[in-house]
Structures are given as structure tokens and as C-alpha cells.
């Protein structure tokens, strides 16, 4: 069954394995999540649990939000996300979900929003090769051919300049190196999408070997 938790990206560091290998890790701070709602097939057409993460001030919450979290007897949450494919019997409304659900060595999928890069050209955005930089060349960093003349239009999907980054990215099959229950930290091998302090979702891997 799937299990997951919401957290924040703190940054990257390094740890040593028992055999002396140096492992780059990303530190995820996952304070206890609260189960706000259980979606059922009878009422909602599908099964899922709704997790809330990171308290926010009541002043910034509207009445529907306050009423929703009151059922779980908790404070309004800044981030609310659903998790499907879980064991519904293992969760109750108001229950806290902590980092202890994971253990070192588990394989997980990590989802976040990539860093925004603004408006970028075809070389940076799509990895295209540039043209000759020598004297006389009139083609340096432009997108190149727009396609055949006959259609009288540019086909959809042509790699062109535009906004880069700020997309939801999922990196699959990352290993949990360490779980620090006292400080609510997950140390995940390698890098994960997004800038520091961005919202991160850690879930059981769907393609783990």
C-alpha cells in the first residue's frame, strides 16, 4: 500500500556510509501531518486520505477552512493534499502522520515544483546546439528552422523560447538514507526538485524494483 508525507526542502548536505562512501543527501523537514478527511468510494467515488501540513494563522483562514479542520481538532493548514492507494483502515481523522512511517533504505518518489528560470532561449530551455560563432555567420543562438514551408504554419510542439521552470516534477526511485524522528527530518539520497523551503511530497515508489 502507498504511504506518504508532506514536508519542506531544507537544503543539501553530505553523510558518510558505514563503508566510508560519501553520499550527497537532500534534507526534508516533515513536521507531523494531520489527516483532515477520508474520501470514500460511497461518498466521493474514490478512496483517499487528505493530509494537512504547516499551520497557518486563523486570521488568514476563512470559515469553510476553519470548519473543515475543526472535525480533525487541529489548526488551519497552509498545504492540503490527497494521497490515494493507502490502507484506509490504518488512518483516522485527526491522526498525525510522522516521518516514522518511513525507514532507512526505503525507495520513494519525491514531487516538488522546479525552480523558475524566467523567459529563456531554446539553447538553455531545450539543450539545442548553437550555431557557428565565427565571422560571417548570421546564426548563433536562434531556434533554427521553423519547419517546412508548405503548411504555412509552425507545428505544435516546436521547441521555442519561453518560460522555463516552475513545473511540477516527480523524481522516482530515490533512497531514504536516514530518518531523524526527533527533528522530523528525512535524508534522501540525491537531489529533489525545487528551491529551499518549497513544498515536497514524499510517497512510496510506484516503480521500485
From Swiss-Prot:
Residues 122-151 are annotated as: Disordered. GO terms for biological process: translation. Keywords: Ribonucleoprotein, Ribosomal protein, RNA-binding, rRNA-binding. The keyword Ribosomal protein applies. One of its GO terms (cellular component) is cytosolic large ribosomal subunit. InterPro entries: Ribosomal_uL3, Ribosomal_uL3_bac/org-type, Ribosomal_uL3_CS, Transl_B-barrel_sf. Belongs to the universal ribosomal protein uL3 family. One of the primary rRNA binding proteins, it binds directly near the 3'-end of the 23S rRNA, where it nucleates assembly of the 50S subunit. Part of the 50S ribosomal subunit. Forms a cluster with proteins L14 and L19. This is Large ribosomal subunit protein uL3.
Amino acid at each position: 500500500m502507498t504511504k506518504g508525507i508532506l514536508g519542506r526542502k531544507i537544503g543539501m548536505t553530505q553523510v558518510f556510509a558505514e563503508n566510508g562512501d560519501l553520499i550527497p543527501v537532500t534534507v526534508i523537514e516533515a513536521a507531523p501531518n494531520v489527516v483532515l478527511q477520508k474520501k470514500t468510494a460511497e461518498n466521493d467515488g474514490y478512496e483517499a486520505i487528505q493530509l494537512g501540513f504547516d499551520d497557518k494563522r486563523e486570521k488568514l483562514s476563512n470559515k469553510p477552512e476553519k470548519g473543515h479542520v475543526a472535525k480533525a481538532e487541529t489548526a488551519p493548514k497552509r498545504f492540503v493534499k490527497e494521497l490515494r492507494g493507502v490502507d484506509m483502515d490504518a488512518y483516522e481523522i485527526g491522526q498525525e502522520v510522522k516521518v516514522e512511517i518511513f525507514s532507512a533504505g526505503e525507495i520513494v518518489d519525491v514531487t516538488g515544483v522546479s525552480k523558475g528560470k524566467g523567459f529563456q532561449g531554446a539553447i538553455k530551455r531545450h539543450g539545442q546546439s548553437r550555431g557557428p560563432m565565427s565571422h560571417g555567420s548570421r546564426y548563433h543562438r536562434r531556434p533554427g528552422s521553423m519547419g517546412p514551408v508548405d503548411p504555412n504554419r509552425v507545428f505544435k510542439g516546436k521547441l521555442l523560447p519561453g518560460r522555463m521552470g516552475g513545473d511540477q516534477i516527480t523524481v522516482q526511485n530515490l533512497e531514504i538514507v536516514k530518518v531523524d524522528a526527533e527533528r522530523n527530518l528525512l535524508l534522501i539520497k540525491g537531489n529533489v526538485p525545487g528551491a529551499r523551503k518549497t513544498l515536497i511530497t514524499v510517497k512510496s515508489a510506484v516503480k521500485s524494483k
